Each structure stands twice: as structure tokens, then as C-alpha cells.
Amino acid sequence: MSSTKFLKPLCRIRAFHTSIARSFTIPFLPKIPQKPGGVSGTANDSSYMPPESRAQGSYHWIVERGLSLAVLPLIAVPLVTTGPISTFTDTFLSLVLLGHCHIGFQSCIIDYISERVYGKVHHYAMYLLSLGSFLSFVGIYKLESQEAGLIASLKSLWDNKPVEKKRQ
């Protein structure tokens, strides 16, 4: 057997494993031209430090970790209890899940649609995320105040039974 029989399939596979710069960009979004190496100025210039912000520093990290840790017991409560959970717990679970999802999608936008590369598209994505989170908050309010709540709605989907509305 010749070695060319084995090398041809490997060459085809190798093409999928190479990393090209264009494979790390979003093709339909306009990009800002970048300087070589992404460095502005000369080697002797000091780097740009963004202004300090309480919303973006360690407080942001603490809130993110707190929401992530709060999700675990709040999801376990409806699984452990057989009856309905309190309205406060249901609302708190809904809001914690909304905050957790908002921060997670915000991190994805910051990582993959960076302001340095995509410019205003980054801001549009953040505005759309904020709008979606606000509309979700309104939906949570409606679900908790006029319907049976998040957990009861999920249980009705699971059991395939209609949900009874809250009495006012």
C-alpha cells in the first residue's frame, strides 16, 4: 500500500482544522478597519485605560455570580415541593432567571460583537437586548399578576392541563 492513499483523506480533513482570520468574523455585519495588530500609537505611548465604572467592575462580577448561584436553589424548590410555591418565590425565580439571561447574552454580545470591530452594531445589539429584557419583564409582570405564574404555567405544559387563572 502506498502512503498517498492515507495522505489524501488527511489533507481534506486538515482544511477544516485550520484557522483563518475571516472565520472569526460575522460576514454580514460591517466592520471598522483595524490597525495592524490592533495597536494604536507607538510602543512608547501609554495604553488607554477606560474610566472606572461601578457597573462594569467587580460589582458587576459579584452580581453575575450572585444571580448564577441564586438560580440553583430557586429551580430546586419547585422540583422538591409537590404543591404550588408562593407567589414571591415564583416571581423571584422569574426575575433571577431574567437577570441571569440578560447578563449572559450581554457577555456574548461583548465577546462576539465587540465595539472595537463592529462599532455601532455593538450598541444596536445592546439596545435590542435591553428592549428584549424590558419586554420580558413586562411579560413576567403579566404572567405573575394575571395568570398562574411561571411554575404553574410550566407544570401545565408538562401535564397538558389548562392553567387556572388567579382570582382577583
Curated annotation (Swiss-Prot):
The knockout note for this entry states: Does not affect SDH or TIM22 complex formation.
Recorded coiled-coil stretches: none
Mitochondrial matrix compartment residues: 24-65, 114-120
Entry GO MF terms:
heme binding; metal ion binding; ubiquinone binding
Lipid bilayer topology? Multi-pass membrane protein
**Residue ranges that the UniProt entry lists as topological domain Mitochondrial intermembrane:** 87-92, 142-168
GO terms for biological process, alphabetical? mitochondrial electron transport, succinate to ubiquinone; tricarboxylic acid cycle
Query: What cellular-component terms does GO give this entry?
Result: mitochondrial inner membrane; mitochondrion; respiratory chain complex II (succinate dehydrogenase)
Q: What is its main location?
A: mitochondrion
What is the transit peptide's residue range?
A: 1-23
The function of this protein is:
Homolog of SDH4, but seems not to be a stoichiometric subunit of either the succinate dehydrogenase (SDH) complex or the mitochondrial inner membrane translocase TIM22 complex.
Q: What is this protein called?
A: Mitochondrial inner membrane protein SHH4
